[in-house]
Design a protein with these regions (language model features):
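Conserved structural position at the C-terminal beta-strand
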Residues: 104-106
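Feature responds to low-complexity, polar/acidic, surface-exposed segments characteristic
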Residues: 23-35, 41-42, 118-139, 152-174, ...
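Short strand-edge motifs at loop-to-beta-strand transitions and within beta-strands
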Residues: 84-88
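Low-complexity "stalk/linker" and mucin-like segments enriched in Ser/Thr/Pro/Ala/Gly
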Residues: 70-83, 154
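Sec-dependent N-terminal signal peptides of Gram-positive bacterial secreted proteins and lipoproteins
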Residues: 3-24
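Extracellular ectodomain surface segments
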Residues: 32-70
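Surface-exposed, short loops/turns at beta-strand junctions within beta-sandwich domains
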Residues: 92-96
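Extracellular and select intracellular beta-sandwich modules with Ser/Thr-enriched
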Residues: 39, 97-98, 110-117
């Protein structure tokens, strides 16, 4: 005996059957990759002093990343570039800790979890603040050099200025590196052994002689046979990298930062690679031959302090 199925029920059964068949045979949607993973960070600056940093995230597929702030800071102002470089400036009178949240976005639109950046606001030991460094990403680095007794800018009519874009001389940078390394200086140095010894200031000679004896520097030739130091010549980024690398005795790395591969001479490539691996190369450097500025030197040396503190 055939069972009678009402037309309406038969129609619904047919629709259900076709829907199930289509679901069973449909190809799964293509995935757009995994979400990036953002890193929690901690930085320190002085009360009222701007500090720069770089947001960090890793994408499993190696996609390019951009960054966006999800939770703003409550004790200061924040400027963030799409590539992750940021500047945080504490509000006057604020102390303790502050923080902000951010996410990383890949080219497929995948978003990371929210990561946090904790900022510690500490009290200075000195009263050195620079009137020409307000809101500058290198302000904290500049003040840190003064705090550590390595370099202090000029005091003009009761106000300190750092002159961040001023080129650093070879003798100035060498002296800062030797002070940072803690190497004992040779005493009562009257002659360094370089052909241009007469052009080297008396205050710099102990640094030059100590660095020469320890292999930190070797000088260069100016077209003649005798080696010269060139104390008052502006130091290049590549030269500074070699001196700092040797002064800190960094471990050689095989990693070469891609941005420098075609702009680094052979004699500087290892040192540039070593500093890049340790995060010591300053933001905005375009070539090894460029003159190193004061603010770039400050950034390099404060990162070097971090490396030494972690040893």
């Amino acid at each position: 005996m055939k069972r009678f199925i009402p037309p309406a029920v038969a129609f619904l059964m047919a629709v259900l059957y076709l829907s199930m068949a289509a679901y069973a045979t449909a190809e799964p949607e293509a995935t757009t990759g995994s979400a990036p993973v953002a890193e929690n960070l901690e930085i320190t600056t002085y009360r009222g002093v701007s500090v720069g940093g770089v947001l960090s995230a890793v994408d499993p597929e190696g996609d390019s990343l951009t960054f966006t702030v999800t939770t703003p800071p409550s004790k200061g102002t924040l400027e963030v570039e799409e590539d992750g470089h940021f500047v945080y400036t504490p509000d006057p009178g604020r102390r303790g800790k502050d923080y902000f949240g951010y996410k990383a976005l890949d080219s497929e639109g995948n978003s990371s979890q929210e990561a946090t950046v904790i900022i510690r606001l500490v009290k200075q030991k000195t009263k050195v603040t620079y009137s020409d460094m307000a809101g500058d990403c290198g302000a904290c680095a500049a003040v840190t050099l003064a705090e550590r007794g390595i370099f202090t800018g000029e005091n003009l009519a009761g106000s300190y200025v750092f002159s961040p874009d001023t080129p650093v001389t070879r003798s100035q940078f060498l002296a800062m590196c030797m002070e940072l390394s803690g190497a004992p200086l040779l005493q009562d140095v009257s002659a360094t052994g370089f052909a241009d010894d007469g052009e080297i200031d008396a205050w710099a000679k102990p640094y030059v002689s100590t660095a020469l004896k320890s292999g930190v520097i070797s000088g260069y030739t100016d077209g003649e046979t005798a080696a010269v130091f060139g104390a008052e010549r502006p130091i290049s980024v590549g030269e500074a990298a070699v001196i700092l690398d040797r002064a800190l005795d960094l471990t050689d790395t095989s990693v070469v930062w891609s941005a420098y591969e075609e702009a680094v001479p052979t004699w500087a490539s290892q040192s540039m690679s070593d500093l890049a691996a340790c995060g010591m190369l300053p933001h905005g450097v375009s070539a090894a031959s460029a003159s190193l500025t004061r603010v770039q030197a400050a950034e390099m040396l404060t990162e070097a302090m971090r490396v030494l503190d972690e040893r």
